[in-house]
Amino acid sequence: TAPTAIRSLIALGDAPLEGKSLDSLRVLGTVGEPINEEAWNWYYEKIGKSRCPIVDTWWQTETGGILISNLAGITPQKAAHATFPLPGIQVLLVDENGIVVEGSDSTKGIPSELVQGNLCIKYPWPGILRTTYNDHERCRQTYFSTYENLYFTGDGCSRDTEGNYRITGRVDDVLNVSGHRIGTAEVENAINMYVDVVESAVVGYPHDIKGQGIYAYVILSKDVTDDSLTRQDILQTVTRIIGAIAKPDKIQFVKGLPKTRSGKIMRRILRKIAEGETSNLGDTSTLLDPAVVNEIVVGKI
């Protein structure tokens, strides 16, 4: 099942489990998005009765199959970790410059500190994608151009001293909402289809149930008089164009967006505000109008 479903059950307490026999369960699975430790432990203790192994798999449509996972009853499991690459899968962590991140693997005599990086794969495997809609160049640019001679998954990842891998989430502007990958640009385009929207910017923020929630900053035309009605209309527009899964969890109406002098939206700032990290917004010296940021912080939902 997906971690989102597990978190939803946790919110209901023990009531859904009362009177249920779970004796026939042998193996549990979690897939679709990274699972947090609280959800993993609840799943293991309440559903699996601390006896059923949890298979936490990592894979993508593009990989054609599971690449990182524990093997039920054979290899060790660890809460919230996909654990080890399957045989033949050469996994690497690299920094933003493509330099391989070493460390945190006691089996190789490397110092024991947690390391993080971008998850890449060094060599091809049987299920690897061959093209993207017969557009080979598009495929190359999307998956193989970020780091030379590596397949870039688009995911961030950490590795511990035993060599266990833990997926930390997407490193680009693709949100993982309840296990569904949703592009922020796609949601923005849908929001902007509504007649009274001038401009919008969408970012993700931590959500207890969904993993990531969708936070939308929206500039409305001056003719709008009823914010609540407009908010509902925007949600309906997004549902119609993309689907209910892409509806913003929070919509904040703003007078302006933080932009550089060249017109680029500073999404980093919007993301920090949505996450509640308003005390450390980083460098704002390149903003065209810094006052916009203060207005957004004050109006944060």
For each of these PLM feature ranges, what is it?
Residues 125, 130-131, 149, 156-246, ...:
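AMP-binding/adenylate-forming catalytic core of the ANL superfamily
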Residues 273-285:
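A short, polar/charged loop-to-alpha-helix boundary motif
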Residues 84-88, 99-143, 182, 277-279:
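Conserved ATP/PPi-binding loop(s) of AMP-dependent carboxylate-activating enzymes
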Residues 1, 10-79, 90:
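Gly/Ser/Thr-rich phosphate-binding loop
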Residues 4-7, 33, 124-127:
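Alpha-helix/helix-capping structural signal
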Residues 32, 59, 83, 155, ...:
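Active-site glycine-centered loops adjacent to acidic/histidine catalytic or metal-binding residues
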Residues 24, 88, 138, 196-199, ...:
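Glycine-centered tight turns that cap/initiate beta-strands
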